[in-house]
Amino acid sequence: MSLLHIAVILPLIFALIIPILYRFFKRIHLGWFVLSVPIVIFIYMLTLIKTTMSGNTVMKTLNWMPHFGMNFDLYLDGLGLLFSLLISGIGSLVVLYSIGYLSKSEQLGNFYCYLLLFMGAMLGVVLSDNVIILYLFWELTSFSSFLLISFWRERQASIYGAQKSLIITVFGGLSLLGGIILLAIPTQSFSIQYMIQHASEIQNSPFFIFAMILIMIGAFTKSAQFPFYIWLPDAMEAPTPVSAYLHSATMVKAGLYLIARMTPIFAASQGWVWTVTLVGLITLFWASLNATKQQDLKGILAFSTVSQLGMIMAMLGIGAISYHYQGDDSKIYAAAFTAAIFHLINHATFKGALFMITGAVDHSTGTRDVKKLGGLLTIMPISFTITVITALSMAGVPPFNGFLSKESFLETTFTASQANLFSVDTLGYLFPIIGIVGSVFTFVYSIKFIMHIFFGQYKPEQLPKKAHEVSILMLLSPAILATLVIVFGLFPGILTNSIIEPATSSINHTVIDDVEFHMFHGLTPAFLSTLVIYILGILLIVTFSYWVKLLQRQPGKLTFNYWYNRSANVIPNYSEKMTNSYVTDYSRNNLVIIFGALILLTFVTIFSVPFNINFKDVSPIRIFEVCIVILLLSAAFLILFAKSRLFSIIMLSAVGYAVSVLFIFFKAPDLALTQFVVESISTALFLLCFYHLPNLNRYNEKRSFQLTNALIAGGVGLSVIIIGLIAYGNRHFESISKFYQEHVYDLAHGKNMVNVILVDFRGMDTLFESSVLGIAGLAVYTMIKLRKKRQTQGNEVKNHE
């Protein structure tokens, strides 16, 4: 097993160990044990920077099911390394922050188990080369995030948010599964790199469009893009460390990773370019607009996260235009990939810090309601400093890193509007317009975030707690991120050669050299747009109290949340009514539906698929076989008209004994003996049960012939006969019985073929079947013992009274 595999599996192993440690080390905060895991992974990933800088990649394989093309293949290039550094680096800071945020009285064993499970799943997503393995880790992120969001499960809002995120992201996961299966059909491979190398085969496939749509749905749901963004604001009910981790650097970035990774395959389609770009821009505008009217600090950050993800998504869509050009023209549009990667890093730094500060404010004051907050500037000066740095970076104000990536975003929108491709030159003017409007509202909610908390009147009477500055443990992580915001803003070259260029080269088909970011590069359209954004943003902030009321009056029926909640109520009710229409308490009706569907399916298949019935190799029917069958049918027929339970049991046993005799004639004496034993025991058990039944020796109701029952019974029998004959006459492969005949004696050293098959060749089946019976028996025994114990206790109470 390689170190790369260990890096992915390590969090999953610790996720199993942590609950055990929690039981034995309750005096020490469990976070100190967990902290070592992401730090070790982060240090290991740092050692791989030189590998990706030189243009090399790391490919490691762990055999799993090689015959099916299913191996645990890990592939690390610049893009995978970038995400791995974010997952482990931000993960380390989040764990450190959680030590100060969560008290020892919390269920820390569960929390860190879920967190490490999520961390390992995210590493698996960004490093897997096998799409099936990627999908398994993808769904594991949804499952583990559900556990994290619902951590405070005593809160109804937490349960609602967790269910909502699970439903939407799992829906996207199923779409992703369909998409990757359609990708694997033309290439006959599950390897992502093989698919990229043979992208032309996929593009010529009739499944290309369907695969593209399904994969985009999977990515959009995970990264909370329009209109699937509604799960993210409700997921804010999770503890703040979860929000800082999942919703700034990891889970919501998984969709961006998928789009970036699949761009070499789908960039040839204009549908990919238009859809990814427009969905990103619409998400940017809509979420930034909604962020301004939120009354909860986490609500503001939730919609701001959706907005920033939309910006990155749009840049990935614009960058795909580069696949339709060559040389310098291609590099012009590929600059959008560079901007997307840079902003992805920047967003993780400033948004992670802002989430942590929000948690600090909540921890200090007991509320996140902006109506109750204000005037905390002198009370929480360190938190104020961190907030100003990171919020201004989010607003796109120099000299912070967010300004550089925001400028790059505006440049890409102006560049894309001039592309003579896919009719972009006709409608492309919308790109910079939407980008500028979205950036204006981004500026507004970023500045208002600072003002809501630290400026205005201090209202101690409305705060559940007396406000105070939080501990150093809660300030250290956001302070580190705020420092990175400044460093990456003033010295972006630290990232360009080591991280950004290798990551961009993983997405783009041409090599990007000499990536540079500057605070000022002339009076360009992007710079002038920035000035317009500042001016309009300040005007909107000054008039905030007037126009924000209009947004807050938005009718509920015009929101996606309204329709989600309505569907969540209507669909279960409709499903229940539909199910109750055919599933009843009457077993006979249920069996009619089940067997009727079987008969219908059988005969539809028979009349739609060509087949042959071959009677040449059928053994001749002997007279004693006919006699046994007549006896069997007679016993079964008499059961229908039996008026005594005892007679029904005897006739049912006669059917079983007749089958045993047939086994003898077909040279299977062991099966016959087994059947005899089973029938004898079954008959004895029936008689014992019969003894405890009410004393009714005869049925009072009059039996009448029911045509439906007869047709269903006859249809099932006929279906089984026809299926057996078709299967016997249409064998496309050699019978497996020959294998047993050749190897039953030399491999298993047995003389009875049936016994050897059951005990050796299918020994695991027999073992598990026996285990199931044993467990069922223990369960029945336990219930009987508990019942007797309760009856004894009840009698004792009565005697005492």
UniProtKB/Swiss-Prot annotation:
An annotated Gene Ontology molecular function: antiporter activity
Parts of the chain that traverse the membrane: 4-25, 30-49, 79-101, 108-127, 131-153, 166-188, 208-230, 243-265, 270-289, 302-324, 339-361, 373-395, 429-451, 472-494, 526-548, 589-611, 621-641, 646-668, 672-694, 707-729, 767-784
GO CC terms, sorted: plasma membrane
Location(s) in or outside the cell: Cell membrane
Description of activity control: Na(+) extrusion is completely inhibited by the H(+) conductor carbonyl cyanide m-chlorophenylhydrazone (CCCP).
One biological process term in Gene Ontology: sodium ion transport
InterPro entries: CPA3_Na-H_Antiporter_A, MrpA/MnhA1/PhaAB, MrpA_C/MbhD, MrpA_C/MbhE, ND/Mrp_TM, Proton_antipo_N
Keyword line: Antiport, Cell membrane, Hydrogen ion transport, Ion transport, Membrane, Sodium, Sodium transport, Transmembrane, Transmembrane helix, Transport
Membrane topology of this protein: Multi-pass membrane protein
Purpose of the protein: Mnh complex is a Na(+)Li(+)/H(+) antiporter involved in Na(+) and/or Li(+) excretion. Na(+)/H(+) antiport consumes a transmembrane electrical potential, and is thus inferred to be electrogenic. Does not transport K(+), Ca(2+) or Mg(2+).
Subunit record text: May form a heterooligomeric complex that consists of seven subunits: mnhA1, mnhB1, mnhC1, mnhD1, mnhE1, mnhF1 and mnhG1.
Protein family: Belongs to the CPA3 antiporters (TC 2.A.63) subunit A family.
Protein name: Na(+)/H(+) antiporter subunit A1
Species of the source: Staphylococcus aureus
The gene coding this protein: mnhA1
